[in-house]
Amino acid sequence: MTSHMAREVAEIPTAAAQFLKLSAGDVQAAAEAMRQADPSLLVTVARGSSDHAATYLKYVVELLAGVPVASVGPSVASIYRRPLRLGGAACIGISQSGQSPDIVEMMLAAGRGGALTVAVTNFADSPMAQASAFCLPLRAGAEQSVAATKTFVTSILAGVCLIAHWQQDTALLNAIDRLPDAMEKALHLDWSPLSARLSRAQSAYVLGRGPAFSIAAEAALKLKETCGLHAEGYSAAEVLHGPSAIVQAQFPVLALAVEDAAQTHVVATAERLAAQGADVFVTGAAAAGATTLPAAPALHPLVDPLVTAVAFYAFVETLSRRRGYDPDTPPHLRKVTETL
C-alpha cells in the first residue's frame, strides 16, 4: 500500500509547477513592495520544517541581495510580549497551516514594529495570512502525512521566487522555471547504498553548507520523524568544532555537496570524517573514502539544494518502511502543531 508521504513526494514537481503558474501575481506584488521598501534587514518567523525553509531563504537573501537575515523567536511576542523595533525591515513568516498562535502573534508584532510582512502558507485564509501585509499561497493541495514534504519544498520555492523577483535576477528566474523538471528527475535517483547502511543505524550526521545546510537540518529531522533514527544536521564547518569527536568507525554521515563555492569544503570535511572511519556518503561529488550518491543535473547554486531535498524525501520514505515504520504517522506527533 502506498503511503500518503510517497504520494505527496511524487506530487512535488506538479505542486511546484502549480505554484509558479497560479501564484505569480502574488509573488510579483510582494516583490514590488520589497523593492519599494528596500529593507536593510530581513527577519524570519517559523518553526519545525518551516524554520529550515527559513534558513534556506536566509542564505538566498544574504548571497543574492547582501541583506542580513535573522530568525526571530516567536515567543518574544507570544510569551514575553516584547515589542521589536523593525522599521526598515521585512519579515517573512512561514507556516504550512498558518495557525500556530506564536507565529501569528509574531507576525502581528512585526507589522506593529514597522516591518513589511509577508506570509508563506498553504492556507491563504489562515490567521497568519490575515495578519500579514502580503501572502504567498502555496496552493500545494492537501498534505495528509504528518511529515511535511511538498509544503516544505513549495515554501522554499515561494521564498526563492520572491527574492529573485525582488532582485530581478534573470539567471535565478530562469533556473526556477526549470525546477519542476529537475524535481521530477530527482524522484528517481538511486540512493540504495545509503538505504542499506541506514537500515540498521542508530545515529547519523547530515552535513551541508550555505542553502544546503538547511536541507541537512531538514533531512536530520525527517530521519528522526519517519525512521526513528537519531540524526543531527550540521554545517560541514561546524561539525569540526566538536561534534566530529564522536565520529568513529562505521558512523554514518551524509554530506550534501551541491555545486557551489562551498563544495570543495564539504568534500574536504567528508574526506576527513571518512579518514576517522566513518561510513560517508556524498551527493553529486567524489570524495576519497566515501560513496558517491547521484544528483540531478545542476541548475543554479541557489536552487540545487532544493532539488536535493526532493531526492532525499523519496529516499527517506522508502527507508522508513524498510525500518518498519509508518512514515505517515510518526509517534507523538500531529499534522498541525500549535504552540505559544
Q: Which stretches of residues belong to each language-model region?
A:
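Generic C-terminus detector
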Residues: A298-L340
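Glycine-rich phosphate-binding loops that contact phosphosugars or nucleotide phosphates
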Residues: R35-D181, R209, S244, L256-A298, ...
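Active-site phosphate/pyrophosphate-binding segments
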Residues: T2-P39, F134-P252, A262, G324-L340
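A broadly tuned, weak detector of single residues within folded domains
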Residues: M1-T2, T308
